[in-house]
């Protein structure tokens, strides 16, 4: 598993999916990954609670001060650790109806970024 300090922060990535943010996402601090969930490694997908966490975690660069290490909730199809998501929404001014892109920047390493409004 890569250490957060070893994650390339400016490397261009392979877009694996884009999702529209809902008011429910904002109210509950999560980002649905449903439409492209199969793009994530199977061993990083766990069950519906922390007790059934995945074997491996992924690194998520969300543009904050630290890279988040988390697995994926296979039942709800979102990042299990969500403490960073409120700050992500606030920092980037994300509102319901905005789009968020997920890119794979290295094996088990991803970047989450808002798509700029036109």
Residues of each region from the PLM?
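Acidic, low-complexity intrinsically disordered regions
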Residues: 1-118
């Amino acid at each position: 598993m890569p250490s957060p300090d070893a994650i390339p922060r400016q490397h261009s990535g392979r877009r694996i999916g884009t999702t529209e943010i809902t008011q429910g996402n904002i109210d509950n601090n999560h980002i649905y990954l449903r439409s492209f969930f199969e793009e994530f490694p199977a061993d990083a997908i766990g069950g519906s609670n922390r007790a059934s966490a995945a074997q491996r975690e992924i690194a998520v660069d969300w543009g904050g001060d630290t890279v988040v290490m988390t697995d994926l909730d296979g039942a709800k199809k979102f990042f299990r650790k969500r403490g960073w998501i409120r700050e992500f929404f606030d920092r980037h001014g994300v509102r319901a109806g905005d789009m968020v892109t997920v890119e794979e920047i290295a094996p088990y390493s991803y970047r989450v970024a808002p798509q700029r409004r036109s």
